Amino acid sequence: MPKGFLVKRNRKSPPVSYRVREDEENRGESLPGWMLLATMCPTGGAPPPSSPERLASAAPSCNNPRPPPAGQFGNPEAVPQTLYSPTRPVSREQRERKYLGSPVSAESFPGLGSSSEALLFPPTSTANGHHGLALLPPVSSSSSISRTHGKRPAPEPDVKAGAAPGTACKPPAAKKTKAIRKLTFEDEVTTSPVLGLKIKEGPVEPPRPRAPSSGPRPLGEFICQLCKEEYSDPFSLAQHKCSRIVRVEYRCPECHKVFSCPANLASHRRWHKPRPPAVPAVQPKEEALSDRDTPSPESGSEDGLYECPRCARKFRRQAYLRKHLLSHQVTKEPEEAGHMMYQSDEQRPQAKSPPSLNVPQECHPCPVCGETFPGKSSQERHIRLLHSSQLYPCKYCPATFYSSPGLTRHINKCHPSENRQVILLQVPVRPAC
C-alpha cells in the first residue's frame, strides 16, 4: 500500500460544508470497502463502545490469521484511528452520516481504490460467514455512486441538450456554391461578351502519338489546347494567335461604329433615337404688334434664329427667347401711366419710376397710332415729331398726356393740394356779418 493512502483524520472536523439527504442514509452498504474495513478492524484501537452489533459482526474478520494491511508496508502511522469524539458519545447513525457524507472518502482518492481492491478484498464466500464483505459492491461502482454526491458531472460535449443520448450529432451541411450554375451555360464558356472573343468549334481528331525526341524534353509541354500546336518555350505559346479564336464585332447600323460588347452597342443606339420635339412657346394674344416698319436698334444680331412674336427681336438660342417672353407677361402699370410722357429723362421724377427688371427691355407702343418701339426714348421722339398737336400738358408739372381724362386723373392723384386751392379761389367770398 503506498504511503499516505489511508487518510489520518484529526479530531477537528475539516471546514467542508455539505448536505446529508435521507436517501443517502439508506445507502450504508455503498461505502468504499477500504473505509469500511478500516473502521471495522483497526489495528491499534478498540471499537467504539456504543456499537455492540458492529463489534459482533467484525469479530470473525478480526480473528483472521492474515496480517493487517498496514503492517505489510511498515507504515503504522497510516492506520486510521477511531472517528469518535471523546467528549460526547458517538452513535451508529452519527458515524454512518459522517462516513456517507464525507467528501474525503468520495473525492480524495478515487483512482487508488480500484488498484488496491485485490489487496484489501480477497475472494471470499458466504459459507465462511463473512456476510458483510461478500455483499459489498466493487470499489469502482461504489466510488462512482459516491462521486455523484459531490460536484455535478460535466455534460458530454458531443451530445446536444435536446437530443437523445444515443443519437450522434450530424455535421452541418456544406453550402452550395453559385459557381455550379454558371458552368451549365455553354455560351459563357465559349464566348467572352466583354472582350468580344469567341472560340470556334474544332474538328474532333484522335490524339496524335507523340514523336520521340532525341534531345531532353522540357518539364512542361507547351501545347495550345485548342489547335494542338506545340511550341518550344512558353513565350512562343503566349504570342501564338490561335485560329479557333475569332473576334466578334458589333457594328452600329447607323454610324458604323464597332463595339466588342453587345451591351455597349445597345447603349450607343439610344443616342440615335429621335427625340420628341420641344413644346412650342405659347403664342401671345397680340400678334398684330409684331410687324414693324423699321428694325429696332436694340434687337439681336442678324444671324439670330429665334424671333420674338411681339417685338421682333431675334435670339441665338430658344432658351433666351423663352426668358424674353416672360418679360411680356409681367403685369402692366395702371392705365394712366401708359398715357403719361415726360419731355426728357432728366425731368422724370425718381419716385414715380417703374421698378427695374432683370429682363430685356420690353416694347413701348405709341398710344396714338399704336406703333411699338423698343425703348422709351424712341417712343417719346416719335410722339414729339408726329403727335405734338394732340398733347395735354400738366400745368403743375412737366408731364404731358394724350387725353383729357388722363390729365384729370393725374391732377387728382399727384396734385390734390394745388387743385384744392384752385377750387377755393373760384368760390365767391361771402361778406362778413
Swiss-Prot record:
Compositional bias of kind Basic residues: 1-12
SMART domains referenced in this protein's UniProt entry, alphabetically: ZnF_C2H2
MF term (GO), any: chromatin DNA binding
Zinc finger (C2H2-type) boundaries: 250-272, 306-328, 364-387, 392-415
Basic and acidic residues: compositionally biased ranges: 19-28, 90-99, 284-295
Pfam family, one: zf-C2H2
Domain of life: Eukaryota
Protein's UniProt name: Insulinoma-associated protein 1
Organism from which the protein derives: Xenopus laevis
Gene name, Swiss-Prot/TrEMBL: insm1
